[in-house]
Amino acid sequence: MLHCSFLRVIPIKNASKRLIIVRSLTSAPAKTSEAEKQQDSLKNIDAGEKYTALGNIRQKKDVFHYTDRASGVGYSHYSSSVYQHRPYIWPPLRKLYHWNYALVIAGMVILMSDFEWLKDQIKSASLPFRPEASQKEEVTESNGEVEEVKEKPKKKKLGFRERRIIEYEDRLRLYSTPDKIFRYFATLKIIDPNEDSGRFEVFMTPEDFLRSFTPGVMQPRRWGLDSFKNYNPEKHKRHKFSDPDSIFYKLGENGLINFSDYLFLMTLLSTSHADFALAFKIFDVDGNGALDKEEFTKVQQLIMSQTTVGQRHRDHITPNQSFRVETNSALETYFFGKDGKGSLSSEKFIEFQERLQHDILKMEFERRDALDNPDGLINEDSFAQLLLLHAQINEKKQKHMLKRVKRRFKGENLKGISFGETKAFFEFLYHIDDVDIALHFHKMAGMSIDAKLLQRVAVKVTGIPLSDHVVDVVITLFDDNLDGKLSHEEMVAVMRRRMRRGLERPRDTGLFRLFDAVLECGKRAYHASPLPFY
């Protein structure tokens, strides 16, 4: 019985084996193809990375795979806390994954592009296709006379890049040393033809000199720190300040300014006439009312040591000879002759200082005139901006003051201000200390300062008549409560800073002065204390 049962079991097992083999044969091609795909995908993978820690074949990772399951079959990297919180990527965007490189490259190209240059190129290329009437002067003939009508230039809006550059240059004017300011704003160099070493001397034009201390005016794009162009006599001999009446013509050929003259001209602009007159009297040993070259050098050194420009000059550490103070500068040649044996009177020197201030004011006026309308007049808003140029008033309050002038002078009230009226008012400001005393006495007497009183004080104190229109603009600019009366305390403070052109300000951020003050207070407390510090 047992033998028979054994024989019966064997066929059953053989039949099951045959069934399993048949099933495996039918499914063998599919498994073989899947295995081949896995093998092909794992060919380029390191042998140690083909399998997981549990011996399973490592599946190919998909960077865009996403699942919300925290655990379970098919979940990988479940031990990582970052994997659960990774950002979800919208499936249509996953197909655009490779376009990210193109977007990054396009963004870098946009950031490095010079749109101003591109705009100028497009404008110059499209110029022949524009109507001639909008670009050229309109010529109208009436009664045999030809009249030219010029289009008013539009004010160019400053972009983000220009505003950042202007802010940097304003900080440079305030806190840098004179030699660095000169190196940044000077644009000309003259190479010495007698030397093969390529040594050169750097010069400023009158426009460069004005730009070096005028805030808000950007240096030309091509020129910057230690970037100069070669001097061309044919080009610069027709300079508009090369006429004999200009003070810059007296400084040398074609009105060029070297570093020594730059330092002393900045000192002239930041020092009053009374200080120079007193210095002349002190160093006039002979008592003849004039100074020789040696005595004038002492006056020059004394005045420069009292100004922020002279105090910040670092002549002892300047490596280039072009930025050292020379003894035979163009100023000394003009004052004492080529041999240096002449004499300089205080009257001649004060006249030179007044002429310098006149030429600087003329350049400032012509720059405003070119922005408004080149007809010899500037509008009231530009005149107000000219007065507030070095006012050191916060931007919000300054905009409020200028807006008051714009509202008052528009339409029929917009008459314009000539250079003669501007010059007369600035000559009135040269006596601002005497004007302050006179206005203070009138206020103590209970008199309100209106337009008529200001004109009367100008004539009595300075002998300079002021036009009604200019006085109206000034009162509107400083009339905070809109009652038609002048707030003379603020006006006097602003005008004093305006006449010094911001050159009296300390050329540092105040941090070192704070440390010096703390150290000085500590020393005084140490010496004044009766108790020992131990």
UniProtKB/Swiss-Prot annotation:
Localization, UniProt: Mitochondrion intermembrane space; Mitochondrion inner membrane
SUPFAM superfamilies according to UniProt: EF-hand
Domain EF-hand: 271-306, 338-359, 466-501
Tissue specificity comment: Expressed at low levels in PLM touch receptor neurons, germ cells, epidermis, and muscles.
GO biological process terms held by the UniProt record: calcium import into the mitochondrion; mitochondrial calcium ion homeostasis; positive regulation of mitochondrial calcium ion concentration
A Pfam cross-reference name: EF-hand_5
CDD domains according to UniProt: EFh_MICU (cd15900)
InterPro entries from the UniProt entry: EF-hand-dom_pair, EF_Hand_1_Ca_BS, EF_hand_dom, MICU1/2/3
Keywords carried by this UniProt record: Calcium, Calcium transport, Ion transport, Membrane, Metal-binding, Mitochondrion, Mitochondrion inner membrane, Repeat, Transit peptide, Transport
Chain residues that bind Ca(2+): D284, D286, N288, E295
UniProt region (Disordered), positions on chain: 131-150
Boundaries of the annotated transit peptide in chain numbering: 1-32
Molecular function via GO: calcium ion binding
Principal place of residence: mitochondrion
Gene3D superfamilies associated with the record: EF-hand
CC annotations in GO: mitochondrial intermembrane space; uniplex complex
Domain free text: The EF-hand domains have high affinity for calcium and act as sensors of calcium levels.
PANTHER family found in the cross-reference section: CALCIUM UPTAKE PROTEIN 1, MITOCHONDRIAL (PTHR12294:SF1), EF HAND DOMAIN FAMILY A1,A2-RELATED (PTHR12294)
Task performed by this protein: Calcium sensor of the mitochondrial calcium uniporter (mcu-1) channel, which senses calcium level via its EF-hand domains. At low calcium levels, micu-1 occludes the pore of the mcu-1 channel, preventing mitochondrial calcium uptake. At higher calcium levels, calcium-binding to micu-1 induces a conformational change that weakens mcu-1-micu-1 interactions and moves micu-1 away from the pore, allowing calcium permeation through the mcu-1 channel. Also required to protect against manganese toxicity by preventing manganese uptake by mcu-1.
Family note: Belongs to the MICU1 family. MICU1 subfamily.
Protein name (record): Calcium uptake protein 1 homolog, mitochondrial
Native organism: Caenorhabditis elegans
Encoding gene per record: micu-1
